[in-house]
Design a protein with these regions (language model features):
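Short, structured segments at the rim of ligand-binding sites
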Residues: 1-441
Length: 441
């Protein structure tokens, strides 16, 4: 079964949406519950596909997961953790990349882990080499088997001195989840320090972990023998908040995003203001709106935190197609993130992608033949067309482009968007979008 979204564009999105816990934190906090010897409670949990996948994987490994029918809070009890068959893991994981993060906690809990061949959004190589190398440095034995990789640690996991060649969020999460119960001290240099990483550290600290974050991207973890449970409210999803902000700009709308956090979005908010977007920052959220005038072009470079997030880039590029002048966007985090512009060009956008680094500083992709810089000329009138969603953020970007376009667009592959956007079609309907959903076999 697959769904097709038929969008009739040209209607400004106006109204209110609510944003809950971050996709880039909640599944990892759920995995962290495996490390404890007591139940954990996770609050502010969104209803997204990634949460469903992790719930299934944890239940498969013997973890009891109970969802509060009223507020959606999750209670996770790992006391009966057990091994699971590779076939079952593969069936439950689907195309999620979460299973790699289960490895450290599973080794601590039951002595072994299996990860199927991984999927995820098709926006770059996203190699798991960092993860496997990290696990080896902790003393894990990594074996390739049919359909995936088996990981064990006959002598247990031991602290290590680890240096990442790039501040990878996934590799940093792997270190945190593996080191907290490893014997000895782990020192991680070149770590990612995104707000979701800090929130994961807060979760682990509540469980009894000893973790310190230094100013030079170094994280120090003192291993402890046992951890308890946690009671934690997940931080809000800054990526979803930024997506709705861009949607307001693209459709000349006015959206109040309940739950949007100024503290975690300051770099985005500065850029939004430079483009010409309006905002009113309140205690419970942020109002984003098109001020009625021209949008300004800009030069933008994505980077790791505290820079401009790569996940913010794609929706904002759609807004830049409506800016008056030439904008330049240099993507330094994922090498193939501009594939989504093909559909925008078919809709009438004027976008050229380049292999050269068009930012202020040459990046790691400059000599590797990747199309990682874009030149956007505007404003251009977007026209409806048929679109197949390529990845999570690119897919949402296509949606808001279709909502701003003249005419009708047919969007397929929208199930991908459910991975990170809670009830997005309900929210679109509440904002006044004109669309229909049909289901095909």
């Amino acid at each position: 079964m697959s769904s097709v979204l038929t969008i009739r564009g040209g209607v400004p999105l106006t109204g209110r949406v609510s944003v809950r816990g971050a996709k880039n934190l909640v599944p990892k906090a759920m995995v962290a519950a495996l490390l404890g010897n007591e139940p954990s409670v996770l609050r502010n949990v969104p209803e997204i596909k990634d949460v469903e996948v992790v719930t299934s994987l944890l239940q498969l490994h013997g973890v009891t997961v109970v969802k509060d029918p009223v507020n959606g809070d999750l209670t996770l009890d790992p006391k009966a953790a057990k091994t699971a068959s590779s076939t079952a893991i593969d069936a439950h994981a689907g195309d999620s990349r979460i299973p790699i993060l289960l490895c450290g906690p599973l080794i601590h809990a039951i002595g072994e882990a299996f990860i199927p061949d991984l999927g995820g959004c098709k926006i770059g190589d996203r190699p798991i080499d960092y993860h496997l190398d990290v696990l080896r440095q902790f003393g894990a034995v990594v074996e390739k088997r049919p359909g995936g990789i088996h990981i064990s640690a006959p002598k247990g996991l031991h602290g290590a001195k680890i240096s990442l060649p790039y501040p990878s969020v996934g590799a940093t999460e792997q270190v945190l989840l593996s080191a907290t119960r490893a014997e000895g001290i782990t020192e991680l240099s070149g770590a990612a320090t995104e707000p979701e990483i800090i929130d994961l550290i807060a979760v682990l600290q509540k469980m009894g972990a000893i973790i310190s974050v230094q100013t030079d991207r170094t994280i120090r973890i003192e291993g402890v023998r046992d951890l308890g449970g946690y009671n934690h409210r997940a931080l809000s999803d800054r990526n979803e908040s930024a997506s709705w902000a861009s949607a307001a700009l693209v459709t000349k709308g006015d959206i109040f995003v309940e739950g949007a956090s100024q503290r975690d979005m300051m770099t985005f908010l500065n850029t939004y203001r430079k483009v010409g977007g309006g905002m009113d920052i309140g205690e419970d959220g942020i109002r984003f709106y098109h001020k009625g005038g021209k949008l300004n072009p800009l030069v933008l470079e994505t980077d790791v935190h505290p820079g401009f997030m790569t996940d913010w880039q794609q929706p904002l590029v759609v807004a830049l197609t409506q800016a008056e002048g030439v904008s330049i966007v240099h993507e330094t985090v994922y090498e193939n993130r501009f594939g989504f512009t093909d559909a925008l060009i078919r809709m009438g956008a004027s976008i050229q992608v380049h292999r050269e680094c068009l930012g202020s500083v040459p990046c790691r992709f400059g000599q590797r033949n990747f199309l990682h810089s874009a030149v956007i000329s505007g404003p251009t009138q977007l026209k409806g067309t048929d679109i197949d969603v390529p990845d999570l953020r690119g897919g949402f970007s296509h949606l808001i482009a279709a909502l701003a376009a003249t005419g009708t667009s047919r969007v397929t592959g929208i199930d991908i968007i459910n991975r990170g956007y809670e009830r997005f079609t309900e929210k679109l309907a509440g904002l006044g979008a004109d669309f229909d959903i049909t289901t095909t076999k």
